């Protein structure tokens, strides 16, 4: 008996060890986890840490049947959270970031998740230690949903663009034509070509209206026949013709002159007689308006047709004859440039005379040559000169001269031209010259010496006509 009880205790202890830990904290037989779905994980550039943005967060109670089966867990979450699309299950541990989520794809993954939750619950009862479930839609489902949403938006846009035209769904060809781009629509291009042709023909008609001849009337382009275009027009019409009601009125230069030359009179409503008889209204005959320019006329020349129209005469009540209308001439006044009198090419234009005062300029005085003459300077003090012998008088011609003198004898051809000259020596002149020597500068002596040398012809022939000294070769 004791052995059986001990064995039962051992089995009980073993069973206790095998029993999962998460069942210790069960409340009412269910496990509660936090579940987030419908959002997405983003990484803000400021924090650079992933965050779960959007979606809903709910606490889901998982029954015991879903703790070991992945299919049971998915079906329970689908029914509880009312999710209609396939999703992927991931869970986050409390000490991990959102970039470290753990995927749950099999029964073994579910059991591991429950064990982790049991360990956390046994160690701490803080709500933050719970495992968080995250439900993410599959990528194929996301792409399908995106395509479906885009298709729905395009369909709504097309219906919005077409429904205002009042076209029902049964007229699918018309709806398809209207949904095409406007610039690529074939009928739009045909209409544009027709409009260009019409404008070109109108311009040709206007230019040929004034230059066409007055023969059989076939020189210009015919009125109604030239404006018919057998082409496909826009919006389903098989043929189109440019009528005068759809085109603006076109006036040529001749029509403008006719309109300016016509005289319009107000219609006379009544004419009264002297006998106070009954009033008889007389209608006035008016010309047709210019808006009927494209009507069928026997003449194709609009310019001739305008000249042949009858002129209204309000007094007589009858239109004038054709010859009277033809005799009327159109007066054309050309506005030229104003007349400017000019001179003939053979005449000179008369210039206005203006009295001008002559200004006399006085010429500056003509410069005259300046001569420097040495003047003897006399001192206020009377210096008594000592008697000097004539033999000791200083000879002014013995002052050093820049001219080189040589002691070589004269050549025989120059000896006949040398004449000795004698100068009288005056004592008074010598005395004054001696006084001048003490008061004048060396420059005065040099000047006097040069003057005397120039006056002495023999001296100049002897000393100044000698050949220059030989030049020595340069050492460098």
From Swiss-Prot:
Tissue specificity of this protein: Observed in seedlings, roots, shoots, leaves, stems, inflorescence and flowers.
SUPFAM superfamilies: CAD & PB1 domains
Biased composition (Gly residues): 212-222
Residue ranges of the region described as Disordered: 204-256
Record's signal peptide: 1-14
Location within or outside the cell: Cell membrane; Endomembrane system
Keywords noted in UniProt: Cell membrane, Membrane, Signal
GO molecular function per UniProt: identical protein binding; protein homodimerization activity
Keyword Glycoprotein: no
Transmembrane segments: none
CDD domains the record matches: PB1_UP2
UniProt keyword Methyltransferase present: no
Comp. bias regions, Low complexity: 233-252
Subunit structure comment from the entry: Homodimer. Interacts with QKY and SUB/SCM at the plasma membrane.
Role noted for this protein: Collaboratively with SUB and QKY, regulates cell growth anisotropy during gynoecium development, thus linking together cell-cell communication and cellular growth.
Protein's recorded name: Protein PAL OF QUIRKY
Record lineage: Eukaryota, Viridiplantae, Streptophyta, Embryophyta, Tracheophyta
